[in-house]
Amino acid sequence: MKDKSIFLKVKDHSVSGETFQLIKNETYGFLETFPQPEEQKLSEYYKTEDYISHTDSKRNLLEKAYHVVRNISLKRKLKLINSFESEEKNLLDVGCGTGDFLKVAQLNNWQVSGIEPNEQARQIANQKTNNMVFETEQLSNFEKHSFDVISLWHVFEHLPKLHAHISILKNLLKVNGTLFIAV
């Protein structure tokens, strides 16, 4: 990071109680969390029942509304990836949460794989996808140029070592493949 101009200080009230800074990266023009949590400890920050994308619970009105909106979103995401013609239809969803997008894609003839660092969410996702969701370390074990589509739905901003991850994903994407990033 070239310039460490503090944009905002924020506290993680949900899990760790730690205070972080959002630092403007002058080189790339976006905000970064500082200090970055260590990659091997990153999943600890999502170990809470209140982190809604890692659970299928519908305990209250907010969670019920989330599932309604998620179902609408899943249909739109599927329509989007289906608009990119591909013979093999191989999809990698990074940060797949509980695997709902993978399940919908799988039901629509996509060969799916997912990456999810949170163990609880990964277990739920594996139940939905016939064990096609793996830990982050698996990224380096996939065959080069093996995916037609790689998606990061609201995950990009959570990735540590951004350049390294982008390089890995680029190598996994087929030559005419598509990378979807939503932040």
Where are these regions (language model features)?
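Alpha-helix initiation/capping motif
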Residues: 14, 35, 66-70, 140
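Short, solvent-exposed coil/turn linker segments
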Residues: 3, 47-48, 70, 132-138
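Residues that form generic nucleotide/phosphate-binding pockets
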Residues: 45, 68, 72, 84
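N-terminal juxtadomain amphipathic helix
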Residues: 1-60
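Conserved SAM-binding loop
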Residues: 76-183
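Conserved SAM-binding loop and adjacent beta-strand
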Residues: 62-76
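Charge-dense, low-complexity intrinsically disordered segments
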Residues: 19, 64, 68, 156
